[in-house]
Amino acid sequence: MAVKWTGGHSSPILCLNASQEGLVASGAEGGDLVVWGEDGTLLGHTCFQGAEDVTNVLFSPSCPTKLYASHGETISILDVRSLKEPLDDFHVNEEEINCLSLNETENLLASADDSGTIKILDLENKKISRSLKRHSNICSSVAFRPQRPQSLVSCGLDMQVMLWNLRKARPLWITNLQEDETEEMESPQSPGQLLNPALAHSVSVASCGNVFSCGAEDGKVRIFRVMGVKCEQELGFKGHSLGVSQVCFLRESYLLLTGGNDGKIKLWDVSSEIEKKHKSPTKHTHRKKTKRAAYTKQGGGTHASVTGEDEHGKILPKLSIEHGEKVNWLLSTKIKGYRNILVADQTSCISVYPLKEF
């Protein structure tokens, strides 16, 4: 069963982030932002003026007390030791912000919004350095690539995934998930796909910087590799029976967490699929070879395979949790030395699941 962190929010939690020191921040509907200790104790709370939903929170890696938060069309920078007044506010987006991403050198902050625009904020000069406009619908997720501070990936409800280099105002590469269904997908296009189009909800880049994942409304998880100025789809599989709301690579590995509107949380090891095509291991990838099967029980239990594939070569999750609520946000972080999964859903509490096997 999951441990529940309660008492911080009274409305559904939309986003989570963790600092390197073990602090956790959560943002909720109605403008609420809470900072927690690693044992779930409430350390701080604020409610932004205007009571607009807090859609993203992001700790600064270099300054663990600094926190970025998006609410409505505003980005606020806060000191977690004193949340009452923001250190700075930026009004750079014209519509509600859905996602924030900080580059590795921490001089640029990307904010993706409902208009489909990605604004690039120069944090040193406190001004917009780029405005990236190519998505024709809501831009739901954006992520800078590790080790490449001028490069990012984005996805949106226009079913498009894009690769950007900030030296150019237009994307280097675009794919339409609905049009680009390949033979790699396990099943041919079915009438159900018209009911569940491949609206893209979430992207996550692995620590190597070259491999990224995208989760979409059609229930599929897609893995791409950046090949210079373009990308290739390495893998695509049906991960959830309903839309994939969250994808999240664990640090320094090709272990991928996914969360869905079907109330399930799954952990996949996609390393073997990636390494089949690229024999040399990717830089900065440290993978533990585990043969242990995970456990299974209802209501926060798991079901997993010992190996990553069944007899038909179909990829299987290493871990499957019956969470029971639509997943709004997933986070993997170490708490007291052990890796855990933190989950935000339609409730006002955070669920914490141990991930000791991995």
UniProtKB/Swiss-Prot annotation:
**Pfam annotation, one family:** WD40
Keyword vocabulary terms for this entry: Repeat, WD repeat
Extract the ranges annotated as region (Disordered). Answer: 278-309
Has keyword Repeat? Answer: yes
The record, for InterPro entries, names: Apc4-like_WD40_dom (IPR024977), WD40/YVTN_repeat-like_dom_sf (IPR015943), WD40_repeat_CS (IPR019775), WD40_repeat_dom_sf (IPR036322), WD40_rpt (IPR001680), WDR53 (IPR042453)
Question: What Gene3D superfamilies does UniProt report for this protein, alphabetically?
Answer: YVTN repeat-like/Quinoprotein amine dehydrogenase
Which pairs of positions does the record mark as disulfide bonds?
Answer: none
Record bears the keyword tRNA processing = no
Compositional bias ranges of the Basic residues kind? 278-294
Q: Where are the WD repeats?
A: 8-46, 92-131, 134-174, 195-234, 239-278
Q: Which domain of life is it from?
A: Eukaryota
Q: Which family does it belong to?
A: Belongs to the WD repeat WDR53 family.
Name of this chain's protein: WD repeat-containing protein 53
Organism lineage: Eukaryota, Metazoa, Chordata, Craniata, Vertebrata
What gene makes this protein? WDR53
